[in-house]
A protein has these predicted regions:
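Active-site acidic-Proline motif in GNAT/NAT acetyltransferases
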Residues: 83-85, 115
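Conserved acetyl-CoA-binding loop-helix of GNAT-fold acetyltransferases
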Residues: 87-103, 122, 203, 210
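A conserved beta-turn-beta hairpin within the catalytic core of GNAT-like acetyltransferases
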Residues: 65-77, 87, 109, 182-187
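Glycine-rich, histidine-containing beta strand-loop boundary motifs that form or position
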Residues: 114-117, 138-140
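Intrinsically disordered, low-complexity, positively biased terminal segments
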Residues: 9, 106-108, 124-130, 134-250
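A conserved beta-strand-loop-helix scaffold within acyl/acetyltransferase catalytic domains
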Residues: 2-83, 226-231, 242-243
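Conserved GNAT acetyl-CoA-binding A-motif
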Residues: 103-116
């Protein structure tokens, strides 16, 4: 049985540091150091581990932030990783739900994180399983990294906004269907994107450029991603006007 719990000791947090190399293949230079995990746990952030019979098989870490304008406190979930052999076991969802539960216990209603728009499995999970929307997009957020999963591409990122106590999120987490405003625009990513990134870097870069250009255009017009459709051929981001979405807190 998988156990999710907060990490408290330096030794446990060192395990999370080691998992970064196993999961993403980061160099020592790019690892988030243990001292940041310790600091996050002490200044209002979150550090959770997922354990299978006492062995850490996943983790997540969030840091506190202030949203402007309005000085609204929120959490930025900077990192979540699960070992490859556990990625279809629901561990990522368990970690996110524990983050949500703990945040709501402190009356924090907003969590954000970033994800690669080409990672269509993650997109489906974030938008359709958790209920996050995408109101912002950032070009080359982290620069070029050494991760084997990034294939040398720029780190263009969707910004996921998860309004933890919204009707949308509660409906989706309960297995229901939220209100679906009319689609205004869409962006498709081919389902074979993982093979393309591994075998045809030039084509992968062209796809990324097209996707990023379209994201920047749509978001500049006040649109946000509120749904994600999957077919055998592609994953498709569905945009609606931001003011029409039922994602605000109750």
């Amino acid at each position: 049985m998988i156990e999710i719990r907060a990490l408290h000791t330096v030794e446990e947090m060192n395990e999370a540091v080691c998992l970064q190399q196993l999961i993403w293949g980061f160099t020592d230079y790019e690892l988030i150091p243990v001292r940041l995990f310790v600091t996050a746990s002490k200044v209002g952030g979150q550090v959770f581990g997922a354990f299978d019979q006492g062995r850490m098989i996943g983790f997540c870490m969030a840091i506190p932030g202030i949203k402007q304008p309005g000085n609204r406190s929120y959490l930025h979930s900077h990192m979540l990783g699960v070992m490859k052999e556990y990625r279809d076991a629901g561990v990522g969802r368990m970690l996110k739900l524990e983050q949500r539960k703990e945040a709501l216990s402190r009356s924090l209603g907003l969590m954000e994180w970033t994800f690669d728009p080409l990672e269509i499995k993650n997109a489906y999970f974030n938008i359709e399983r958790l209920g996050a929307i995408v109101p912002r997009y950032v070009l080359n957020q982290y620069g070029t990294t050494s991760s084997k999963l990034h294939y040398g591409l720029p780190t263009d990122r969707c910004v996921a906004a998860w309004l933890l106590d919204s009707a949308r999120v509660e409906t989706i987490l309960a297995g229901g269907q939220p209100e679906r405003p009319a689609s205004v625009a869409s962006i498709s990513v081919p389902s074979e994107i993982y093979e393309i990134k591994a075998n045809d870097p030039a084509r992968a870069r062209d796809i990324q450029q097209r996707v990023s250009d379209q994201f920047m255009e749509h978001i500049s017009k006040g649109l946000a991603v509120t749904a994600f459709h999957r077919t055998p051929e592609a994953g498709t981001y569905i945009f609606t006007a931001l003011h029409t979405t039922s994602w605000d807190s109750k």
